[in-house]
């Protein structure tokens, strides 16, 4: 498979590792921070940190917005679903995040809360249209790159005159986190590793 099999070419990996070792000044320590949990997963899955010279260090950054979400936000979402009888729509990766009192959205669903896993904010809007007698709340989460779909669904709801749809907005901004890390951390990275999804 293109761009998968290439990762398994041992000769190419050894050549690249040797080039990195040759370029890295042994008198200097290099610190790179991967920002997103997806980056961390790729580095670990393919063993990339194991081939780096000892003076080239990867620092795990803030991670995923789901993992950074304050417990109180999950508690608030559960309260909406359990006590206000709303249809709470969320992405699958939020379902098992631990919340207060040993709860999670998954456990709240097991207790009778109407929590639905969706793939797109538009799925939540369609649920609202199909259930006009119920309030449908989209539990919006993600880095700032996920805010446009949230904005689009709100605009679509307004244009369609849907009155039983709302958003519990929990988007996370990356610049504040990076600024804090770059200013305050003793082991701060020289280079944060960003991509087109997260970062400039």
What does each model-identified segment do?
Residues 1-133, 147, 155-160, 166-168, ...:
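Metallocofactor- and cofactor-centric catalytic cores in central/energy metabolism, strongly enriched
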Residues 170-200:
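Catalytic alpha/beta core domains of metabolic enzymes, predominantly
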Residues 87, 135-137, 191:
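Structural motif
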